[in-house]
Amino acid sequence: MEKKFKLIYKDKEIKLVFNLNVMQAIQEEYGTIEKWGSLTDGESGEVDIKALKFGFTAMANEAIDIDNDDNGTDEPFFTTKKAGRIISDLGFDKVVMAINETVINSTKDDSEKNA
């Protein structure tokens, strides 16, 4: 379930991870993953910027935390302000697509295993 999606920002790789830790953070903030998803997918109107920044920050910080654990590094975590600057520079469409792909690719194997 821990598949990483990668974005390039200012010649640096940003990884996004959607796992149980990220799911828990989203549920604590938005109640359900489905509710958060409807706020960030843009299908029913304007993308909720706070929800987008929250999800992006949670996914990026989880990837940083995993890399820090795996590699013995101490890469700093993103703030929501930094996430906002990155999202603005990369563009909403690109980031929304990256978040959606991360969620879909991280969860599709689980449903196949349970079938």
Model regions: which residues?
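Amphipathic alpha-helical interface surfaces
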Residues: 22, 48-56, 95
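Charged interaction scaffolds used for protein-protein
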Residues: 1-8, 28-44, 68-115
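Glycine-centered positions within short beta-strands or beta-hairpins
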Residues: 9-13
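Active-site-adjacent beta-strand anchor residues
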Residues: 16
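Short, hydrophobic/amphipathic alpha-helical patches that form generic packing surfaces
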Residues: 51-62, 101
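Residue-level signal for threonine
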Residues: 19
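Short active-site loop/helix that positions an aromatic residue
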Residues: 25
